[in-house]
């Protein structure tokens, strides 16, 4: 069972600055659309994971380090969408529902440079992973969740490949 980032078991863990440097992923050989940063250990693991992919396939990091303000905007926007879809929903319930897809700011790994949004690319562009990047559960009929069954066989295979190389490099694929 997935533990959501809004869960008390997560939110009560203290966040401590370790001093680990942030590095430009491009300088580590990672494909990015523009300058993206992550903690050095994350960048190193991504570089290793990239080497595990078959010839012609690469990791492509869409977003790494995210300013707190951007994370808050994403969270606020998604919560507003959920409130429109579920009139009368309690603040607590919208918080939990939103955390299936967007990390609450107080524990969001992106704001620490500890998470990346990524996909796989080949010679002709992005590989099929079943949904566009950032498709919400509502927009994708739940297909954005890693174990979704309403995606193509090709997308399932590509998701499994992505999870395998990330895991082999010591990274965790958050399944929501």
Question: What positions do the PLM features span?
Answer:
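Extracytoplasmic cell-surface/polysaccharide-interacting catalytic and binding patches
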Residues: 1-64, 68-175
């Amino acid at each position: 069972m997935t533990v959501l980032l809004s869960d008390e078991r997560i939110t009560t863990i203290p966040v401590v600055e370790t001093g680990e440097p942030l590095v430009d992923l491009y300088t580590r050989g990672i494909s990015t659309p523009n300058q993206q940063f992550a903690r050095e250990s994350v960048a190193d693991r991504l570089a290793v994971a990239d080497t595990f992919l078959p010839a012609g396939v690469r990791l492509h990091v869409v977003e790494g380090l995210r300013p707190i303000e951007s994370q808050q905007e994403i969270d606020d926007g998604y919560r507003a969408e959920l409130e429109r879809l579920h009139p009368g929903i309690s603040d607590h319930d919208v918080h939990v529902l939103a955390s299936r897809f967007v990390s609450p700011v107080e524990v969001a790994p992106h704001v620490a440079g500890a998470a990346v949004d990524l996909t796989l690319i080949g010679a002709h562009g992005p590989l099929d992973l079943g949904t566009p990047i950032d498709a919400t559960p509502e927009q994708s009929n739940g297909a954005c969740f890693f174990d979704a069954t309403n995606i193509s066989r090709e997308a399932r295979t590509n998701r499994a490949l992505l999870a395998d190389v990330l895991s082999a490099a010591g990274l965790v694929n958050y399944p929501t």
